[in-house]
Amino acid sequence: MNSRQIAVNPMRLKRTRYRYETSGQWYKGSLHLHTVSSDGHLTLDELIQKYSEEKFDFISVTDHWCLPKLNGNRRGWPLLVLNGVELDGYDHLGSYYHVLAVGASLKPPLFNGNFLKTLRTAYSQGAILIWAHPYWTGNSLQEGIRHKFHGLEIYNHSSQCENGSGYALFHWDGMLNHNPDFLGFATDDSHFIPEQPYWKGGWIMVNAADCTQQEILENIRRGNFYSTQGPEFKTIEFGENSVSVETSAVTYVRLIGPRRTGRWVHALGRHPNFQAEFDLSRDWPYARLEIEDA
């Protein structure tokens, strides 16, 4: 697939609650990364250096069953590092999952391999639970509905490069029909091992007043971010029954509703500041925006 896409988190329509408030600044972040503490090949400091050189403002290191050691180094780092961990295991019905817990404050004694117990503890402590690469893992929609995930990876760059299983838009639309507040994330899942050198392929842009742990996590929880492989939203604004956007140079802007509903604009000429406006249907339980630049 040659095009690069981005997806904006859904706007719940029947209750007239629009998700976005974009008066702050946009901050670039990557939420699924691994170091030598699990199955990655870079140290935490090396990983931070890589992502800071690419103008990332924050990252979440999500090693398998291992919280990053952030002791006292935060002030000297060129970007914000959020606590995170990747959990994996089987649930009570025998289904297998990978789940990111971003903003986790779990203590090491809880990492005893009990997947469901640790997942519930992370949820109770306020971690953002992200259903990781469901297509790659082979999860069904019903397996996602079964647990209290806050969102899922709609794009995982490592899975896409490895065997073409990185996209999970079918899972996302199914989850949105079940829960219109369900969030969509684009991630790298970077390891920096010779057979998996992939990175810089998927990230999120969070709109926040400042790049602090509290501000970033709060706005991720609210869904005040978009996921991207490159194209940019500059503004997202709402009228009484409409949404208008300004974007980077794109070829398509789409408003996507449930099942086969939706609207689109073909952006001929690829203006560097393209603008589009859509009427919103009150009959839709949710709508999401998508732009494409090639």
Walk through the language-model features, giving the residues of each.
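C-terminal functional module detector
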Residues: 1-26, 179, 190-294
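A metal-dependent hydrolase metal-coordination microenvironment
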Residues: 6-132, 136-148, 153-174, 178, ...
